[in-house]
Design a protein with these regions (language model features):
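Conserved sequence/active-site signature of Rossmann-fold short-chain dehydrogenase/reductase
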Residues: 23
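Local beta-strand N-terminus motif with an aromatic residue
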Residues: 15-16
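A short glycine-rich, Lys/Arg-flanked "PGG" loop and its adjoining helix->strand segment in the class I
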Residues: 33-45
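Class I (Rossmann-like) S-adenosyl-L-methionine-dependent methyltransferase catalytic domain
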Residues: 1-9, 29, 33-34, 48-136
Length: 136
Protein backbone atom coordinates (compact mmCIF):
# COMPACT_ATOMS: atom_id res chain seq x y z
CA UNK A 1 0.00 0.00 0.00
CA UNK A 2 1.27 3.45 -0.88
CA UNK A 3 1.69 5.82 2.08
CA UNK A 4 -0.82 8.18 0.44
CA UNK A 5 -3.49 5.46 0.75
CA UNK A 6 -2.92 4.56 4.40
CA UNK A 7 -5.82 5.41 6.71
CA UNK A 8 -4.92 5.66 10.38
CA UNK A 9 -6.80 2.94 12.29
CA UNK A 10 -8.38 5.34 14.79
CA UNK A 11 -11.72 7.13 14.80
CA UNK A 12 -12.04 10.85 14.17
CA UNK A 13 -11.08 13.14 17.05
CA UNK A 14 -9.42 10.39 19.11
CA UNK A 15 -6.34 12.20 20.44
CA UNK A 16 -5.25 15.37 22.21
CA UNK A 17 -1.62 14.99 21.09
CA UNK A 18 0.16 13.41 18.14
CA UNK A 19 3.91 12.82 18.13
CA UNK A 20 5.62 12.58 14.76
CA UNK A 21 9.28 12.36 15.70
CA UNK A 22 11.62 11.58 12.81
CA UNK A 23 8.67 10.55 10.66
CA UNK A 24 8.31 13.49 8.28
CA UNK A 25 12.07 13.44 7.62
CA UNK A 26 11.38 10.19 5.74
CA UNK A 27 8.19 11.03 3.83
CA UNK A 28 7.96 12.42 0.32
CA UNK A 29 5.62 15.38 -0.32
CA UNK A 30 2.43 13.49 -1.22
CA UNK A 31 2.74 11.12 1.73
CA UNK A 32 3.56 13.99 4.08
CA UNK A 33 0.46 15.92 3.02
CA UNK A 34 -1.72 12.82 3.43
CA UNK A 35 -0.33 12.07 6.90
CA UNK A 36 -1.03 15.65 8.02
CA UNK A 37 -4.66 15.27 6.89
CA UNK A 38 -4.92 11.99 8.79
CA UNK A 39 -3.38 13.59 11.88
CA UNK A 40 -5.87 16.44 11.68
CA UNK A 41 -8.73 13.95 11.35
CA UNK A 42 -7.66 12.02 14.44
CA UNK A 43 -6.90 15.07 16.61
CA UNK A 44 -9.63 16.61 18.73
CA UNK A 45 -10.27 20.35 18.21
CA UNK A 46 -7.47 22.15 20.01
CA UNK A 47 -5.30 19.01 19.87
CA UNK A 48 -1.58 19.43 19.31
CA UNK A 49 1.00 17.92 17.00
CA UNK A 50 4.68 17.76 17.94
CA UNK A 51 6.69 16.95 14.82
CA UNK A 52 10.25 17.06 13.59
CA UNK A 53 11.71 18.04 10.23
CA UNK A 54 14.88 19.08 8.50
CA UNK A 55 13.91 22.65 7.53
CA UNK A 56 15.72 24.46 4.74
CA UNK A 57 15.50 27.97 6.15
CA UNK A 58 18.46 30.31 5.55
CA UNK A 59 20.56 28.65 8.25
CA UNK A 60 19.59 25.19 6.98
CA UNK A 61 20.54 26.08 3.40
CA UNK A 62 23.88 27.48 4.56
CA UNK A 63 24.59 24.36 6.62
CA UNK A 64 23.76 22.09 3.67
CA UNK A 65 25.97 24.20 1.38
CA UNK A 66 28.85 23.81 3.85
CA UNK A 67 28.78 20.04 3.31
CA UNK A 68 29.08 19.46 7.05
CA UNK A 69 25.55 18.28 7.81
CA UNK A 70 24.34 14.75 8.24
CA UNK A 71 22.34 13.77 6.47
CA UNK A 72 23.70 15.57 3.47
CA UNK A 73 20.99 16.92 1.19
CA UNK A 74 22.09 17.13 -2.42
CA UNK A 75 19.23 16.01 -4.69
CA UNK A 76 16.50 18.58 -5.37
CA UNK A 77 12.83 17.68 -5.25
CA UNK A 78 9.78 19.91 -5.30
CA UNK A 79 9.79 21.89 -2.01
CA UNK A 80 13.05 20.41 -0.72
CA UNK A 81 16.09 18.19 -1.01
CA UNK A 82 16.80 14.47 -0.66
CA UNK A 83 19.73 12.87 1.10
CA UNK A 84 19.90 9.95 -1.37
CA UNK A 85 17.96 9.98 -4.65
CA UNK A 86 18.37 6.18 -4.91
CA UNK A 87 16.56 5.77 -1.57
CA UNK A 88 14.36 8.90 -1.48
CA UNK A 89 12.81 8.24 1.93
CA UNK A 90 16.24 7.91 3.55
CA UNK A 91 16.18 11.61 4.41
CA UNK A 92 14.15 14.58 3.21
CA UNK A 93 14.56 18.27 4.01
CA UNK A 94 11.78 20.76 3.25
CA UNK A 95 11.29 24.48 2.74
CA UNK A 96 9.69 25.89 5.91
CA UNK A 97 7.18 28.08 4.04
CA UNK A 98 5.84 25.00 2.26
CA UNK A 99 5.57 23.11 5.56
CA UNK A 100 3.54 25.97 7.08
CA UNK A 101 1.31 26.02 4.00
CA UNK A 102 0.57 22.29 4.01
CA UNK A 103 -0.14 22.38 7.75
CA UNK A 104 -2.74 25.07 7.02
CA UNK A 105 -4.16 23.15 4.05
CA UNK A 106 -4.59 20.14 6.34
CA UNK A 107 -6.49 22.23 8.91
CA UNK A 108 -3.56 22.62 11.30
CA UNK A 109 -1.82 25.78 12.41
CA UNK A 110 1.89 26.06 13.17
CA UNK A 111 2.26 27.60 16.62
CA UNK A 112 5.99 27.23 17.24
CA UNK A 113 9.20 26.24 15.46
CA UNK A 114 12.38 25.29 17.32
CA UNK A 115 15.64 25.19 15.44
CA UNK A 116 17.45 21.87 15.40
CA UNK A 117 21.14 21.35 16.04
CA UNK A 118 21.66 19.57 12.71
CA UNK A 119 22.21 23.00 11.13
CA UNK A 120 23.63 25.00 14.04
CA UNK A 121 26.24 22.51 15.25
CA UNK A 122 25.47 23.74 18.79
CA UNK A 123 23.80 22.36 21.88
CA UNK A 124 20.02 22.36 21.70
CA UNK A 125 16.78 20.63 22.53
CA UNK A 126 16.54 18.53 19.36
CA UNK A 127 18.78 17.38 16.53
CA UNK A 128 15.96 17.91 14.04
CA UNK A 129 13.86 21.06 13.76
CA UNK A 130 10.68 20.88 15.84
CA UNK A 131 7.36 22.12 14.48
CA UNK A 132 4.49 22.36 16.96
CA UNK A 133 0.98 22.76 15.62
CA UNK A 134 -2.65 22.77 16.66
CA UNK A 135 -5.88 21.58 15.11
CA UNK A 136 -8.08 24.64 14.66
Amino acid sequence: MAPEEYVFPWPDESFDLTLAISLFTHLLPGALQHYLREIRRTLRPGGRIYSTFFLLDERGKAAVASGLTYPTFTAPIEHGLLHDPLVPEDGVAYEPDWICRIFEEAGLGVTRVYEGTWKTFAEGRSYQDVVVGVRW
